[in-house]
Amino acid sequence: MFKQFSFAALLAVAALSTGCASVKMADDTQDAQAKTFQVSPDKAHIYVYRNESMGAGVKMPVALNGKPVGATVAKSYLMLSVPAGQQTLVSSAENDSELKLSAEAGKNYFVWQEVKVGFIKARNALQVVDEATGRAGVNESKLIQAQ
């Protein structure tokens, strides 16, 4: 019985780490521009990034203030330009992860979309990270075209 459970768990992990998810990527020029991290004085930028390979075959939709803005895959990120004020991000997988932040104009915010092993499919957690960590994560990822 234990061997059957172990085999099933191994298959689940393998399924979560491989697969064939695709999203529309931005071109190299847009990616390079986003990685300058320049923000206009009247807006804030929120970078939602997923820089790990875990769950590579799983798209994870992201919504900003109740509106879909895109879906991440492994080694990808979204750059969202928002007005100052309260912003709510929701990322969906086996679970929904919600993050509220108060954006200030002229600032960048970095949100790591951590992928975790779930019961049926991948789970996720949104976490605000410091600028150095966020820039490094974005720099090893590729820009997704926002919806």
Predicted regions and their residues:
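Sec-dependent bacterial lipoprotein signal peptides
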Residues: M1-A21
